[in-house]
């Protein structure tokens, strides 16, 4: 199982391994070599049919559930060389379940709210989410064979700083369709 990610403002995609998927809403403990944790809000879909080079006409047949979550990135110490952000840290892909029926994205008025615990509230209106997801499924399937159970995630905003080592501990909560979908602490 892969988590295929389309970064914000980029036409290419990359894969995160399944070890990055956080299923149980547990607290995130940062590795010692990471000085900062950044996050990017995402909308994601679960692939329900294997395929390659999926066409726009048939893309709705290839996913059966959607959701909202966040991807965590680690900013390494300066000694790590040319790495800007680390995307393969275990349990750093917060893609909660249960998933929603894709029909919820059709009205374009659903809101994904994130509270970072630092008096910062982020509200994202998902007006183009269905189009973004379907475009990402089509474009990523040109490079990667989709398998049943894969996730395709699209970053809705550029990654931003969540916490630094000096912050110690920060909480993060997310709501979608007026339901709390995740809540955890990031401990540096």
Task: Describe the function of each predicted region.
Residues 1-151, 158-188:
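Catalytic-core "active-site belt" of small-molecule-metabolizing enzymes
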């Amino acid at each position: 199982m892969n988590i295929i990610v389309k970064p914000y403002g980029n036409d290419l995609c990359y894969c995160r391994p399944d070890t990055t998927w956080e299923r149980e809403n547990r607290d995130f403990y940062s590795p010692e070599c990471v000085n900062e944790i950044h996050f990017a809000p995402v909308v994601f879909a679960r692939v329900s049919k294997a395929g390659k080079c999926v066409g726009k006409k048939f893309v709705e047949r290839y996913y059966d559930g959607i959701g909202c979550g966040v991807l965590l990135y680690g900013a390494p110490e300066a000694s790590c060389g040319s790495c800007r952000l680390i995307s393969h840290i275990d349990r750093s892909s917060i893609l909660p379940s249960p998933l929603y029926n894709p029909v919820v994205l059709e009205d374009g008025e659903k809101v994904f709210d994130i509270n970072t615990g630092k008096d910062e509230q982020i509200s994202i209106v998902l007006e183009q989410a269905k189009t973004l997801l379907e475009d990402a499924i089509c474009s990523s399937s040109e490079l990667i064979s989709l398998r049943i159970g894969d996730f395709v995630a699209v970053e809705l905003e550029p990654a931003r700083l969540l916490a630094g080592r000096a912050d110690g501990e920060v909480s993060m909560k997310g709501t979608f369709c007026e339901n709390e979908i995740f809540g955890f602490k990031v401990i540096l």
